[in-house]
């Protein structure tokens, strides 16, 4: 699978990420021009977590983000559908669980906060995944989605599209272990809803107080929400 227009098969998605796992962190830093570190910091700050909180880091990949979340003093678990990604991060000392975002292996109301970064695009049924995140979050608990989005400035959006569709694939061929995965990345970003569209999906999944904030000119957006009380 390389085109975002194809139906997402969960096992094909997992296999694609297994194939890029070995050089995933380096590739992300290179292709994002170092912005990935900034995006992780902002995601952690938006969650507002601390000691005593239980946090699910979904689509955690190699658990780089989970380690940074755990620095807050919260208990954090990394979950990902790609066993290869989790294995590539085995040196990182946080709990790791392999699981499908639409069928999470956790009990109801297990977490105070849930976050997913750059993974919701790859979930076969986005709303079902968001509903499952709500199921495992306690009432009043928090959600933060960090995902690629739509630049707000038209001129910048044009430059970004050129980078996404032309420069990024060339750079991926130089540094990535599976360049086709980054062709899929570019196409999946183009097919993804804008900030308001994603907010509507989050609300449709039962979350409340949905709001968003743009990062890097709207290349990325942080959507935050709260699970309503019973």
UniProtKB/Swiss-Prot annotation:
Molecular function terms from GO: demethylmenaquinone methyltransferase activity
Keywords carried by this UniProt record: Menaquinone biosynthesis, Methyltransferase, S-adenosyl-L-methionine, Transferase
One Gene Ontology biological process: menaquinone biosynthetic process
Pathway(s) per entry: Quinol/quinone metabolism; menaquinone biosynthesis; menaquinol from 1,4-dihydroxy-2-naphthoate: step 2/2
CDD domains the UniProt entry points to: AdoMet_MTases
Cross-referenced Pfam families: Ubie_methyltran (PF01209)
PROSITE patterns registered for this protein in UniProt: SAM_MT_UBIE, UBIE_1, UBIE_2
Residues that coordinate or bind S-adenosyl-L-methionine: 62, 80, 100-101, 117
EC number: 2.1.1.163
Top-level taxon in the UniProt lineage: Bacteria
Catalytic EC class: transferase
Reactions it catalyzes: a 2-demethylmenaquinol + S-adenosyl-L-methionine = a menaquinol + S-adenosyl-L-homocysteine + H(+)
InterPro entries: SAM-dependent_MTases_sf (IPR029063), UbiE/COQ5_MeTrFase (IPR004033), UbiE/COQ5_MeTrFase_CS (IPR023576)
Function: Methyltransferase required for the conversion of demethylmenaquinol (DMKH2) to menaquinol (MKH2).
HAMAP family with a match to the protein in the record: MenG_UbiE_methyltr
Family assignment from sequence similarity: Belongs to the class I-like SAM-binding methyltransferase superfamily. MenG/UbiE family.
Annotated protein name in UniProt: Demethylmenaquinone methyltransferase
Species this chain originates from: Mycobacterium sp. (strain KMS)
């Amino acid at each position: 699978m390389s085109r975002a227009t194809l139906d997402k098969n969960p096992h094909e998605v997992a296999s694609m990420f297994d194939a890029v796992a070995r050089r995933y962190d380096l590739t992300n830093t290179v292709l994002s021009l170092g912005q990935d570190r900034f995006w992780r910091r902002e995601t952690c700050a938006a969650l507002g977590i601390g000691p005593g909180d239980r946090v699910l880091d979904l689509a955690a990949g190699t658990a780089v983000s989970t380690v940074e979340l755990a620095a807050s003093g919260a208990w954090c678990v990394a979950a990902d559908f790609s066993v290869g990604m989790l294995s590539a991060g085995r040196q990182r000392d946080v709990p790791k669980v392999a699981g499908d975002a639409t069928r999470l292996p956790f009990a109801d109301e297990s977490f105070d906060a849930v976050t997913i970064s750059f993974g919701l695009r790859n979930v076969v049924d986005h709303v079902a995944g968001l509903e499952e995140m709500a199921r495992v979050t306690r009432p009043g608990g928090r959600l933060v989605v960090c995902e690629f989005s739509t630049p707000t400035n038209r001129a910048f959006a044009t430059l970004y599209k050129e980078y996404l569709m032309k420069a990024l694939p060339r750079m991926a061929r130089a540094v990535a272990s599976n360049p086709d995965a980054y062709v899929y990345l570019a196409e999946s970003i183009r097919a993804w809803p804008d900030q308001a569209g994603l907010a509507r999906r989050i609300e449709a999944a039962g979350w409340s107080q949905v709001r968003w904030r743009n990062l890097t000119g709207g290349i990325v957006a942080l959507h935050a929400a709260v699970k309503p009380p019973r």
